[in-house]
C-alpha cells in the first residue's frame, strides 16, 4: 500500500445558509479535526467544476450537498466519472451524505428521493484494521 500524501475534501455545494451561520462550512469541519502537519488538506469545489486529483497519493472525502445525485448538473456527472476513474486506481474515499450517494450512484446503484424528506443524524462507527493503517 502506498503512502498517502494528502487529503482532498471535495465540497459539493456552498452549504445551507442556516447551517453555515450556526456551524460554519462543512468543508472546514473536517480540516479542523485533522492535523494538517500530518496530512496536508486541499479543498476542491466540485460544484464549481473543480475536480479532484487522480493520484495514488491522495485520499478523497466527498461531502454533502443541497443538491441530489439524480439532478442534471454537469459537475455531478463529471464527479461520477472521476469517482469511477478513482476506483480503478484504488483511491480511498469516504462519502458523507450526498458524497455516499454519489459514490453508489457512480457504481450503478439506484438513488431515489426519500418520500419522508431529509434524514439527519449521527451514528457511531469503528475503524477496521485496514482503516487504521
Regions from the language model: what does each represent?
Residues 1-89:
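N-terminal beta1-alpha1 cap of cysteine-dependent amidohydrolase-like domains
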Residues 38-41, 111, 133:
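Secondary-structure boundary/capping signal
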Amino acid at each position: 500500500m502506498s503512502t498517502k500524501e494528502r487529503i482532498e475534501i471535495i465540497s459539493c455545494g456552498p452549504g445551507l445558509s442556516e447551517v453555515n451561520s450556526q456551524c460554519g462550512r462543512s468543508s472546514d469541519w473536517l480540516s479542523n479535526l485533522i492535523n494538517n502537519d500530518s496530512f496536508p488538506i486541499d479543498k476542491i469545489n466540485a460544484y464549481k467544476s473543480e475536480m479532484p486529483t487522480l493520484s495514488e497519493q491522495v485520499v478523497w472525502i466527498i461531502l454533502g450537498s443541497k443538491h441530489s445525485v439524480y439532478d442534471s448538473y454537469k459537475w455531478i456527472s463529471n464527479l461520477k466519472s472521476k469517482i469511477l476513474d478513482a476506483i480503478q486506481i484504488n483511491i480511498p474515499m469516504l462519502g458523507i451524505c450526498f458524497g455516499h450517494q454519489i459514490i453508489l450512484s457512480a457504481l450503478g446503484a439506484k438513488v431515489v428521493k426519500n418520500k419522508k424528506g431529509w434524514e439527519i443524524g449521527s451514528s457511531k462507527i469503528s475503524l477496521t484494521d485496514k482503516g487504521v493503517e
